[in-house]
């Protein structure tokens, strides 16, 4: 075995209970998941919130890893302490150092099995290109969104989120578990291939690049005055064009997409994710792009995993 | 207008946010809902829990209306006080008395639009027979379940629950809102017909009579060891027979329905409702029955609404 360790995180949000359940089953039965001969650390991100069945205690753990906050002496939220704890235990310079972090989430949106990367770190892009090449799943590239920062995986040299949905919060679902299991297996297999220099990279990576968040239309007291339109509800990853209905009020007032030219396509993701309403996000708009897989991505990942 | 008042309750569970949103829209625009010339009182069942986005504060409000508890001097849960408050304000002998209570819920189960009645109170059976005759929706008759008691509507002389799903908790959904709106309209229309002696009762009422709750298979520490089988997930109201798979473990172990003869049909409801896991209910089993509409049902409802 190489000295590389992979950190697998579940329950970063305490009401996303499928991955934590899967990890628990795995603990009881080693053979459930093929580790592809990789050293693994598994951890529950927010065990207190999981116990209480809620997303978080004081604040969203997956927005609590901002470096300036972690270095501050003025922490008070439970999730800031938990973030520090996770980094000092499993961070690249921690007691039990891991080089890659994979954070398993679920969503009420119809995201299927998908990956999320933050920014354009070369090693992230390299590893997700391998997983996409294997499973064909879509990748949401989250960047340039100052209101949303401090994601867990950003505290590791390489890392990404697995999002599986749709599933309500607090509900175990056989299909969601199986999708999570399949994606986890592919992640470990591809990491193992990199460690063993058996990779075949694709020529291109398909990303859905974050453009902007779209909020519900709201009345003067902040309550949504329109709801996600039925022609877009559940249609994550389906391209839409200028003029497509986004929201509809009970009186039939439509809010349309007013973006781009007549033929330009945009791809909405995280449509009506329950947890994002408090963040004023009814959906996010992305642009589908094909990127050539770059040598420096491959080199960065290779250097990290074959030091 | 007659002196009859109908109490419409939303947000009895604080994370079922669709009906509360609909009531809020209604407040802003009177014409949204046709009251069919009935006196209406609307109220948010559990406003504190709604504000906090959770099902309840201390205990399930919709299990907090047990008469012995409400008469006890030893109350301590927030929901017991709220139950007392609702009854003393809107109860049949309250400051602002209502004769019928309709309690609007949503569920993560695929219940469609459906009604729930508790026990076999004649006036309840009469009114739901009229609504079923109008909309064709299924009715779950909950009875003989000692572990589940103290439902809100039982504190009124007549009352029932409207359940609409599937929808995750904490998520506004256009279709769920529209289903709620349509059912609400039918409820008010039929009550108005009774008040105005314009009813045409059907000959029969179709009920799905509660037989038993079925829990997840659990390991020694109480964690579910199997999940709802994919052939039954989302299949509320579809009949199943002896031998039908109910649960499946990750190792492929099946738990089958072992009930009744080879040809006997049972109908599962509230399959994988997120909030029921803590109540050890993975689904409830019912029996579909056709009951003749009885004269005493009609008389009881008529006496209540035309005193």
UniProtKB/Swiss-Prot annotation, chains A, B:
Substrate binds at residues 55, 62-63, 163, 276. The keyword Chloroplast does not apply. This is Probable aspartoacylase. Zn(2+) binds at residues 13, 16, 105. Binds 1 zinc ion per subunit. One of its GO terms (molecular function) is aspartoacylase activity. Its cofactor is Zn(2+). GO terms for cellular component: cytosol. PANTHER family: ASPARTOACYLASE, SUCCINYLGLUTAMATE DESUCCINYLASE. Belongs to the AspA/AstE family. Aspartoacylase subfamily. The keyword Hydrolase applies. Keywords: Hydrolase, Metal-binding, Zinc. It catalyses: an N-acyl-L-aspartate + H2O = a carboxylate + L-aspartate. NCBIfam families: PRK02259.1 (NF002601). The lineage of its organism: Bacteria, Bacillati, Cyanobacteriota, Cyanophyceae, Synechococcales. Its EC number is 3.5.1.15.
